[in-house]
Amino acid sequence: MELTPHEARVIGVLLEKEITTPEQYPLSLNSLTSGCNQKTSREPVLNLSESEVQNTLDALTKKRLISEQSGFGSRVVKYKHRFCNTEFSDLQLKSSELAVICLLLLRGPQTPGELRTRSNRLHDFHDVSEVEATLNELHRREAPLVMLLAKEPGKREARYRQLFSEVDANLVQALSSSLGAETASPQEKSALEARVCTLEQEVTELKAQLQSLLNN
């Protein structure tokens, strides 16, 4: 299963809202767009239009990762995921695993400590070791769902990333190491961080295009 950056954001929002605001789930296009563009709990912050979100939904529908639902007497179409833990899903996740994957989809690579701090509305992790155990379980699967990135110089913890939106891991690790160079100024580090994010998205989109060509 490979997701583009926009697809990862949409799936992440649907997973999050299903848990945190079940009374509002499934989501309308308007609600889903607002969730994708939230200024908090999202990295990077996006500014997607409804048409961009709709195009993403259409792509996810073709991948059978979402379904539409129309309410009785309502013309508003709402969307729910088929990403995991449904009768149509091959992927089954425990609540702890779901929380970690959701956060990685919404906020990119994170340390176990960051995941524990940010997961309080999704799952109650008692301590960081419980998060680490969950990450290990996700990594030890027959088809790993997360990977450990190279530790950045000067950082106490290494970060993990999800493997649904695939990137060149060696490229990311090399650029991540550059971020901690003692000679780099704050402005240079910021520019490198932006470059890493851009390259991740470009590689993911190129792989999606290649897969589409191979399938045709």
UniProtKB/Swiss-Prot annotation:
Pfam families named in the record: DUF480
Organism superkingdom: Bacteria
InterPro entries named among the record's database cross-references: DUF480 (IPR007432), WH-like_DNA-bd_sf (IPR036388), WH_DNA-bd_sf (IPR036390)
HAMAP family: UPF0502
Family: Belongs to the UPF0502 family.
Protein name: UPF0502 protein Spea_2482
Lineage, uppermost ranks: Bacteria, Pseudomonadati, Pseudomonadota, Gammaproteobacteria, Alteromonadales
